Amino acid sequence: MTKVQISGYGDNLTINGTRLGDLSPADHEAIEKAKGGQNYAPLENVVVSSVQDLSTLICRKPDPEGVKAYIEEELLDGLCCYSAVNQGQLNETIVQAVIKHLTEERIPTVPRSIRHKYMSAFLLAATAITGMDKVVPKVAGVEAAELLAKLSRRWGYRVKGIPSNEALLVVAANNFHGRSLFAVSASTDKESREDFGPFLPGIEVVPFNDADALEELFKAKGDRIAGFIVEPIQGEAGVIVPSEDYHPRVAELCKQYNVLYCVDEVQTGFGRTGVDFAHQLYGVKPDLMGCGKAAGAGIMPVSFAAGRAEVINTLTPGSEGSTFGGFPLAAVTAVYAIKVLVEENLAQNAREKGARLLDHFESIRQDFPDRIKEGRGKGLLTAFQMFDEPHLDGHKVSLGLLKEGIYAKETHRHTVRVAPALTITNEGIDHIAEALRKVIASL
């Protein structure tokens, strides 16, 4: 029988004689290559160790003198776990709520087959913040997106009257809805799809920000289309902001052709774009919305689908479920994530600090018009795009920012996404801009 000996905490956490505090960045990389799947390409020569404050991580880098296993430096978190930590790293209000419920309230772990009192708190808070009739809790963001697809199909059969097994879903090209089989079936990204087929049928693709193409598809196949699933702003594609009239027209077309308008707010929600949810930027209200990431404030994985009662009510006992979806600790975490979003005015701060950051991007673009094509975004979901030249490499920029104490990450070759905590200060924004200017000047 294989034995595993585990002891200690933090740096003293020891697995079969290997103590974390003794490992260099190269040691961590070697362990990951030997023992883990290679489905990520982490930034080289850096290992995050702990949190200093809401926007700052403590990381370990190789000792330039080669004496110690590592040196420690501060790192401003400009990625926020892909917008999962909008409330800031280890937000004290949420952490204390979790600790109190674990240690004083003796919060249980039970499934949905028996009611627990914290579900009521979650449902009341989630419907209030989203403005939706009903909510179904899940765990991962991709589960929320997938539930949008399942709900659309079921509504299509049971309410719209689409013949059995003929329902179609529509998605936008260059989308990102996660990594499940549904999500990659809906994806147009070659790397996400390669050698994972055969894919799920019944999915149609139209260009993003092209309502005319959507209308043509609705005219041709609208009687069998159950739902259109779309990101308000495409995040993983490079922070692609649609025209102001796109979502209003999409909502109108969906209503005209009796198609569910479903928005994936997993990355754009919870204040990230300067409003509570990005669809609000365009004055529309979806039939369904999927939320995740910051719904758990980076402390617990929490997601959910919210929507009109007519749609959610198509679910019946046994038709949908999740062991940890809405379990008590997740419910409490989500409630306090919402509390912080509202009481700390995170959307407003994102709006103000995002405008400041975009002003910096424009100033840098003007100083380097041969290198920076544009800066774009809404709130603190931002990106800057360089021209398509070999020396203007996004990964090189990410590594340069790392040397300047900023953690940001390229998305596609020439675009770098910057999405810090919504609690960031003006000084933090200026620090990002100063570092970026220095790195761009060095290219």
What residues fall within each predicted segment?
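Conserved N-terminal phosphate-binding loop of PLP-dependent enzymes in the Aspartate aminotransferase
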Residues: 2-443
